UniProtKB/Swiss-Prot annotation:
Location in the cell: Nucleus; Chromosome
One Pfam family linked to the record: Helicase_C
Composition skew (Basic residues), residue ranges: 1022-1033
Biological process per Gene Ontology, one example term: rDNA heterochromatin formation
Gene name of this polypeptide: Smarca5
EC class (word): hydrolase
Residue(s) carrying N-acetylserine: 2
Organism (species): Mus musculus
Binding of ATP, residues: 204-211
Annotated protein name in UniProt: SWI/SNF-related matrix-associated actin-dependent regulator of chromatin subfamily A member 5
């Protein structure tokens, strides 16, 4: 067994048989002093009231009889009596465990508020008449008098002893299999908590069966204590199905129900299932609890079990406040992660469990001296003593000997050429930060870190990085990412070995890329992330775990797939990227490394070499090592260690920057996968050896005291370099200059939009300011160009050679020849230039031009009347004149492609509005009373939220108000609120204008499809009928004669 905090439960009687036994009245309270581990432990007698007596077995309601509701109408005396008995036994038991509890119990008794408004939600406080007893019990400085001792002995002898139960084998009510030895010990520990009126935390490492031990406890309550419920189990939404299946599998006699669904489904469940009371255990999620809190408050709960208990570590959170308001006899917290954040969060959990003991956070913090706790061994021991009665934590390596080991290998990969370009671009954007010249804002640093991590995963996570459109799924998906290259080599080897793989990533868009990759390589896969619906989530897990499953890969987001999921059929875990918190990655590994696993689990962690990822993983490894050194039993870590300072983030960003800047070539090699794995295993072993030699002080500072340090990189000690960082700076790579091509030489100089070249070619000091959108005659630009060339000749300007042009020497020669042969403007040309300067739209500025373009986009190029109204300060005649010239000479504009695309997008929207209006007119026109008769052809897109009556109203009212009217959806929302038809339809009345718009867009799409189908059907029927038959007049009339008259037939 681990050295984890495992408290000694009350010992069984001496005559306890191998099966569960009961010590009745007159049984001795002393005996073998064996705890759950069989070691010596102080005996705790089974005192009166430590469990409900026979008279206390009566339920608040007749739990088994149908038709009776469990709704609480008034306080139940049995319930209150049980609470008072538990309180007295709790104090007595805790004081026998350690005298430290006198510190908490005594002030708690003194400080109990009398006003209900001042009481914190949770368990009832100690009454006034109990204060004196607690004070005398807590005073250990004076010996008791003989009289006091006699009175205590008399009181003890007058108490009726209660039944104590201890299992030495798996209970008979557990049907599907048998509990393992350590699970039986865990069940006994939970039972001892109940018998002593103590609430606790079951903190076994993930995969050790906390779910089964909890279900066994509730089964014990029903079969041995005659308390079937009501119990509540509060779990993450992702594990609801797993909990329900575990109840049915292990203890089928427990009637479990699950509260989940939308508003209507929940209301029906409460009415038909919850209130009638034909159940023992209600399993629900955190979200459902918050939504249905008013219903749950109506019950006197026996056991409240909270899975993933860290959700209530903040006592001010909404969930934490709500669960404290429930009436509960016993509370149990489950967590697979260490209590690692800070002492205040630990107090929050203890306050939830025992608010009458731990009622003051300030007193708790001062007692353990939060700031110095980890450095004071006595305080650490004191913390262990306080935790011992409440916390049970065991580790796989100690209790589950049959579980194969887990082997982790760090695989270091290089950057591809595209990744280096994007990595460089990100660093260059914030080069001032790298060189400590800019403002070091924490959010800015976090953003840089996030962007660099995206680049390490795959450059296609950035918009515009992937070549296309059209987008293709082929080898470029692999070659442009170093991690994908290694993955493409690793997966075929694993498939050949018969392994099955879990791939975890922090980013769901990485899963999108992996999904395309698996389809391209024909790997069968499942996927699970935070957006996966609950039903699909369970279907995927079942499909992957079923016998002889053909699914090879299961890709999961680390946060969504890291809790409450059993994927022990996989034996390989690939961490595509690493989390800041090492516990999150450990939870991901435990999806496969858990009870039921028969193979050695191999974990491959991908790390991009010489990047920020190296520092993130190193920091996580050090933090994990520190967790194992400091307070191993309670797993408490100094709260400051979780915070990343700005200096540390800067060092992470700077790491490898010079290496990335030094080259643009890919670092990906053609090394085979066996060589990559061998090299990774070697580096992993070296890192583990360094960590094992590190002292606690080094771990706290995330530094190494050994000669070989992670800060010693390529022969340089970066700790020493950090001291002189202000004198050094990272030299950015040389900037690549873009060649600036233009049709006209003048616009190359006068209308430059790209980066100016150095040195910039000189221009005459007094040049007229002309813009291309003013549409001056082309002759003017020829004269201005001639003037510029002559000016450069007069100052002796020499054209520099541009290194970016392929024929730089020839271009330089031609440009210089123009300057050398330039002549000044003569009088006629000067006069012509002045005349031409008056022939453009000189009174149109950039603002007028932009308004003109936006008006064309809004109304379309042909609606000149509305366009003229949009351009401020211009008469309709001026706009009409400008519009005519614009459409005639628009190709002279420098950004004409961008401008035309903007206008055409607007015109497309106009056409779309027209087609939608036509579709609505056609649909509404088919009915005389559309508000009552209109039917919508949903097909398979009905949806679950909106009814047909609601959809009918939305379409008809949208048509009535006018689809293209401004703010039409705000008016539609107001119409819904004013309509008596929906006065009780809270769902529809609570929709926002944006939600109504989305629903209307869906309905319009359905209507357009319906109209199209009807038109095609009508065309087909017309074609089937053929042309209309000709008239039969020829039978009665004769053919026309030569003058065009018809002859009559002679009869």
């Amino acid at each position: 067994m681990s050295s984890a905090v495992e408290p000694p439960p009350p010992p069984p009687p001496e005559s306890a048989p191998s099966k569960p036994s009961a010590a009745g009245a007159g049984g001795s309270s002393s005996g073998n002093k064996g705890g759950p581990e069989g070691g010596a432990a102080p005996a705790a007698p089974c005192a009166a009231g430590s469990g409900p007596a026979d008279t206390e077995m009566e339920e608040v309601f007749d739990h088994g009889s149908p038709g009776k509701q469990k709704e609480i109408q008034e306080p139940d005396p049995t319930y209150e009596e049980k609470m008072q008995t538990d309180r007295a036994n709790r104090f007595e038991y805790l004081l026998k465990q350690t005298e430290l509890f006198a510190h908490f119990i005594q002030p708690a008794a003194q400080k109990t508020p009398t006003s209900p408004l001042k009481m914190k939600p949770g368990r009832p406080r100690v009454k006034k008449d109990e204060k004196q007893n607690l004070l005398s019990v807590g005073d250990y400085r004076h010996r008791r008098t003989e009289q006091e001792e006699d009175e205590e002995l008399l009181t003890e002898s007058s108490k009726a002893t209660n039944v104590c139960t201890r299992f030495e084998d798996s209970p008979s009510y557990v049907k599907w299999g048998k509990l393992r030895d350590y699970q039986v010990r865990g069940l006994n520990w939970l039972i001892s908590l109940y018998e002593n009126g103590i609430n606790g935390i079951l903190a076994d490492e993930m995969g050790l069966g906390k779910t089964l031990q909890t279900i066994s406890l509730l089964g014990y309550m029903k079969h041995y204590r005659n308390i079937p419920g009501p119990h509540m189990v509060l779990v993450p939404k992702s594990t609801l199905h797993n909990w329900m299946s575990e109840f049915k599998k292990w203890v089928p006699t427990l009637r479990s129900v699950c509260l989940i669904g939308d508003k209507e489904q929940r209301a029906a469940f409460v009415r038909d299932v919850l209130l009638p009371g034909e159940w023992d255990v209600c399993v629900t999620s955190y979200e459902m609890l918050i939504k249905e809190k008013s219903v749950f408050k109506k019950f006197n709960w026996r056991y409240l079990v909270i899975d993933e208990a860290h959700r209530i570590k903040n006592e001010k959170s909404k969930l934490s406040e709500i669960v404290r308001e429930f009436k509960t006899t016993n509370r149990l917290l489950l967590t697979g992660t260490p209590l690692q954040n800070n002492l205040h969060e630990l107090w929050s959990l203890l306050n939830f469990l025992l608010p009458d003991v731990f009622n003051s956070a300030d007193d708790f913090d001062s007692w353990f001296d939060t700031n110095n706790c980890l450095g004071d061994q006595k305080l650490v021991e004191r913390l262990h003593m306080v935790l011992r009665p409440f916390l049970l934590r065991r580790i796989k390596a100690d209790v589950e000997k049959s579980l194969p080991p887990k082997k982790e290998v760090k695989i270091y990969v290089g950057l591809s050429k595209m990744q280096r370009e994007w990595y460089t671009r990100i660093l260059m954007k914030d080069i001032d930060i790298l060189n400590s010249a800019g403002k070091m804002d924490k959010m800015r640093l976090l953003n840089i870190l996030m962007q660099l991590r995206k680049c390490c995963n795959h450059p296609y996570l950035f918009d515009g990085a992937e070549p296309g459109p059209p987008y293709t799924t082929d080898m470029h998906l692999v070659t442009n990412s170093g991690k994908m290259v290694v993955l493409d080599k690793l997966l075929p080897k694993l498939k050949e070995q018969g392994s099955r793989v879990l791939i975890f990533s922090q980013m769901t868009r990485v899963l999108d890329i992996l999904e395309d990759y698996c389809m391209w390589r024909n790997y069968e896969y499942c996927r699970l992330d935070g957006q996966t619906p609950h039903d699909e989530r369970q279907d995927s897990i079942n499909a992957y775990n079923e016998p002889n499953s053909t699914k090879f890969v299961f890709m999961l987001s680390t946060r969504a797939g890291g809790l409450g999921i059993n994927l022990a059929t996989a034996d390989v875990v690939i961490l595509y990227d690493s989390d800041w918190n090492p516990q999150v990655d450990l939870q991901a590994m435990d999806r496969a490394h858990r009870i039921g696993q028969t193979k050695t689990v191999r974990v491959f962690r991908f790390i991009t070499d010489n990047t920020v990822e190296e520092r993130i993983v190193e920091r996580a490894e050090m933090k994990l090592r520190l967790d194992s050194i400091v307070i191993q039993q309670g797993r408490l870590v100094d709260q400051n260690l979780n915070k990343i300072g700005k200096d540390e983030m800067l060092q992470m960003i700077r790491h490898g920057a010079t290496h990335v800047f030094a080259s643009k070539e890919s670092e990906i090699t053609d090394e085979d996968i066996d060589g990559i794995l061998e090299r990774g295993a070697k580096k992993t072993a070296e890192m583990n050896e360094k960590l094992s030699k590190m002292g606690e002080s080094s771990l706290r500072n995330f530094t190494m005291d050994t000669e070989s340090s992670v800060y010693n990189f390529e022969g340089e000690d970066y700790r020493e370099k950090q001291k002189i960082a202000f004198t050094e700076w990272i030299e950015p790579p040389k900037r690549e200059r873009k060649a600036n091509y233009a049709v006209d030489a003048y616009f190359r100089e006068a209308l430059r939009v790209s980066e100016p070249k150095a040195p910039k070619a000189p221009r005459p000091p007094k040049q007229p300011n002309v813009q291309d959108f003013q549409f001056f005659p082309p002759r003017l630009f020829e004269l201005l160009e001639k003037e510029i060339l002559y000016y450069r000749k007069t100052i002796g300007y020499k054209v520099p050679r541009s290194p970016d042009l392929p024929n730089a020497a020839q271009a330089q020669k031609e440009e210089q020849l123009k300057i050398d042969e330039a002549e000044p403007l003569n009088d006629e040309e000067l006069e012509e230039k002045e005349k031409l300067l008056t022939q453009g739209f000189t009174n149109w500025n950039k603002r007028d031009f932009n308004q003109f373009i936006k008006a064309n986009e809004k109304w379309g190029r042909d609606d000149i009347e509305n366009i003229a109204r949009e351009v401020e300060g211009k008469t309709p005649e001026e706009v009409i004149e400008y519009s005519a010239v614009f459409w005639e000479r628009c190709n002279e504009l420098q950004d004409i492609e961008k401008i035309m695309a903007q206008i055409e997008r607007g015109e497309a929207r106009i056409q779309r509005r027209i087609s939608i209006k036509k579709a609505l007119d056609t649909k509404i026109g088919r009915y005389k009373a559309p508000f009552h008769q209109l039917r919508i052809s949903y097909g398979t897109n009905k949806g679950k939220n909106y009814t047909e009556e609601e959809d009918r109203f939305l379409i008809c009212m949208l048509h009535k108000l006018g689809f293209d009217k401004e703010n039409v959806y705000d008016e539609l929302r107001q119409c819904i609120r004013n309509s008596p038809q929906f006065r009780f339809d809270w769902f529809l009345k609570s929709r926002t204008a944006m939600e109504l718009q989305r629903r209307c867009n869906t309905l319009i799409t359905l209507i357009e499809r319906e109209n199209m189908e009807l038109e095609e059907k009508e065309k087909a029927e017309k074609k089937k009928r053929g042309p209309k038959p000709s008239t039969q007049k020829r039978k009665m009339d004769g053919a026309p004669d030569g003058r065009g008259r018809k002859k009559k037939l002679k009869l």
